[in-house]
């Protein structure tokens, strides 16, 4: 099987997580930013991740990929409902979190932005979605205050999380994205959670790029 991704993309992280967790072999292929032709040829639209299955067919949608791969090797890990409290936390933090993360993603060390043209394409895409990225960067102190308050509230929610389940495919990609932000105040429970899930799924954090 072959998994087509962007390295920065939190939805792609979900697909990478299930392969790492199941210890199943997969070839990872990075689609360049600005390349709409490749994903459109595969699934009819510009989207990632895309799983290229052994029979030559293609599967988009991150959680569909998670559930498909989950069924290839026991035990199943992604068949339980998502924890409501964690889901609500993710929804409440996503706005300020991505306002912090996106400007840093545009400057990040990711294979899909390895050429100047690809980086320009990604930056233009995010400016269309988020507006002036310099203005967003200038809001960092206020955004960090909001996100760090949310991180404090997350501590009891992750304290009891040990085995990876469906909820972690929602929570971990968000928190992994946030590790690119210098000053994000992960509490001890969140730090332990990130380290554990990163190790179990073989998905690296972005802490070494934090700015």
Feature map (PLM): residue ranges:
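Charge-dense, extended regions
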Residues: 203, 207-211
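Short, flexible loop segments at boundaries between secondary-structure elements
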Residues: 196-204
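GST-like fold's C-terminal all-alpha helical module
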Residues: 93-195
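GST-like domain detector, emphasizing the conserved glutathione-binding G-site
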Residues: 1-121
């Amino acid at each position: 099987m072959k998994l087509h991704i962007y390295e920065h993309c939190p939805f792609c992280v979900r697909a990478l997580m299930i392969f790492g967790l199941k210890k199943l072999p997969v070839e990872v292929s990075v689609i360049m930013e600005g390349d709409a032709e490749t994903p459109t040829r595969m699934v009819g639209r510009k989207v990632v991740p895309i799983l290229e299955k052994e029979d030559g067919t293609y599967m988009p949608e991150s959680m569909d990929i998670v559930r498909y791969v989950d069924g290839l090797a026991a035990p199943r890990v992604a068949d339980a409902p998502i924890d409501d409290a964690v889901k609500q936390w993710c929804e409440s933090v996503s706005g300020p979190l991505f306002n912090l993360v996106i400007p840093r993603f545009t400057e990040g060390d990711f294979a899909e932005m390895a050429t100047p043209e690809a980086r320009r394409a990604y930056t233009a895409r995010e400016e269309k979605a988020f507006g002036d990225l310099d203005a967003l960067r200038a809001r960092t102190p206020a955004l960090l205050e909001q996100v760090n308050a949310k991180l404090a509230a997350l501590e009891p929610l992750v304290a009891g999380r040990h085995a990876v389940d469906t909820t972690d495919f929602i929570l971990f990609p968000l928190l992994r994205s946030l590790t690119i932000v210098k000053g994000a105040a992960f509490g001890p429970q969140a730090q332990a959670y990130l380290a554990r899930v990163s190790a179990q799924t073989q998905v690296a954090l972005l802490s070494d790029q934090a700015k």
